């Protein structure tokens, strides 16, 4: 495999581990990576062996996958470039919001050590991506709330912190329904057996699948006590829902 192709593939694995762990609070194991990346478990196993050989990941006795210091550095660099590319696409090129993730994935590997700081300056030193994720190295703490809309009690008003960005169809649904970082939202009713949640987003009433709601991370409306969360673990709220959610 040519070195450039190999590096791109390695970076994709490293960033997937980084996002699952730091952005979504997942315990990262091989089967979840296969589901997330939509590739076969044997392919994941082969790449993990290569990443271990290169001292980029470690696998502990429970089969949990961890980034080494160098793996974390590599992943964080690619995440930073990806999110800067998203900002470029949406704020400068005016690309449709829901298309930015996929297009940024094509651009991120072309951003160099020379162009990255200039891009950061030209964009006005953004601190978050269009989808609400912190940009590493932008000067804000990388501490994210791990509670999703699916875990908020009915009638509790919260603010959307960030949304799952890796599904263009889902992002378009979010956009059309006003589900964006910073928007206020109140879950009004949960139909557990139907798997749906009805929420008020701004002035709109939106019905979505509970799996979709688990891909919307939220913050308390104002500083102070945490909102009344309904039993969903704040650190593991996204577990079991990685991959390609649907809005039904």
Model-identified regions with their sequence ranges:
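Intrinsic disorder/low-complexity segments
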Residues: 220-248
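Key DNA-contact positions within bacterial/archaeal DNA-binding proteins
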Residues: 42, 98
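Mid-protein regulatory/catalytic core that forms ligand/cofactor-binding pockets
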Residues: 108-214
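Basic, amphipathic "hinge/linker" alpha-helix immediately C-terminal to the N-terminal HTH DNA-binding motif
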Residues: 63-82
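N-terminal helix-turn-helix DNA-binding core of bacterial DNA-binding proteins
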Residues: 4-39
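Short, hydrophobic-biased segments on the C-terminal half of alpha helices
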Residues: 48-49
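A short, conserved structural fragment
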Residues: 52-61
């Amino acid at each position: 495999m040519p070195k450039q192709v190999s590096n791109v593939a390695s970076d994709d694995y490293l960033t997937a581990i980084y996002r699952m762990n730091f952005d979504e609070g997942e315990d990262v194991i091989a089967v979840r990576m296969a589901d997330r990346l939509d590739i076969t478990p044997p392919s994941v196993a082969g790449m993990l062996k290569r990443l271990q050989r290169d001292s980029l990941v470690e696998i502990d006795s429970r089969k949990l996958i961890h980034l080494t210091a160098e793996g974390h550095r590599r992943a964080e660099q690619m995440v930073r470039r990806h999110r800067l590319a998203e900002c470029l696409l949406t704020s400068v090129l005016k690309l449709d919001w829901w298309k930015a993730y996929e297009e940024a994935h094509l651009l991120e590997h072309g951003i160099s050590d020379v162009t990255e700081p200039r891009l950061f300056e030209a964009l006005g030193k953004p601190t978050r991506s269009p989808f609400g994720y912190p940009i590493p190295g932008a000067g804000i703490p990388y501490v994210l709330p791990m509670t999703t809309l699916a875990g908020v009690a009915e009638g509790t008003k919260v603010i959307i912190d960030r949304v799952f960005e890796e599904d263009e169809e889902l992002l378009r649904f979010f956009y059309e329904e006003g589900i964006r970082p910073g928007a206020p939202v109140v879950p009004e009713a949960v139909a557990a057996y139907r798997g749906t949640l009805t929420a008020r987003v701004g002035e709109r009433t939106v019905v979505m699948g509970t799996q979709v709601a688990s891909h919307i991370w939220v913050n308390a409306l104002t500083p102070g006590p945490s909102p009344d969360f309904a039993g969903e673990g704040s650190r593991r709220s996204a577990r079991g829902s990685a991959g390609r959610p649907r809005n039904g």
